Amino acid sequence: MALKTFVKISTVNNLSDARYCAGMYVNLMGFNLEEGNKDYLSPEKYKEMTDWLSGLEYVGEFEASHPDAILETAKTYEGLSYLQITEELHIPMLLNSSFNLILKQEINDVNILQHLLAKAPSLKENNVILLLESDSLDLKDEVKDLIKAIAEKCKVLLGFGLDADNISSLLEELPIEGIALKGGDEIKPGFKDFDELADILEVLEEED
């Protein structure tokens, strides 16, 4: 079994999410490694979880840490393939590391998309994947047109505006590399309501 597109799961903080998503053959699984963040995962819990998993790659997710601190932290998490950051200025300081890079950007208005369109060729040149998230924008035509233009110039993971009803049409309409979904908190250990995440992944399952 496989999924119809490249899928990253972000902020995984429990074994229920991790095992379910691995079983659904997602490509990347992200863990927040920044102490103080509500989704922070300690090296011990990371190892405990990843010891159960196979067949996918791991992303260390950071919001505000300096690159030196990011690289130091990453040493204590065995098996990371990617680092996810939010600051464009940090890219040059991490390019020569052994990690692939994902730049996560929060899109509050179309001006940010215009800025990213100008930056996209540089991201492609440096093999940086662009992850777009938003709590405020809808996937209206203007927004989709800009995302399409960006995705034609660099690899884009779309992380907002997705649901089980529109995911198939969006993948046909936009030349994106894939999508990004978020894990969530367990109701209690071992019990999890997957809701939209599971609905979307089930739509993306390839039929044998």
Language model feature labels by segment:
Residues 1-97, 108-132, 137-208:
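Conserved N-terminal beta1-alpha1 strand-loop-helix module at the mouth
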Residues 100-102:
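ATP-grasp fold ATP-binding core
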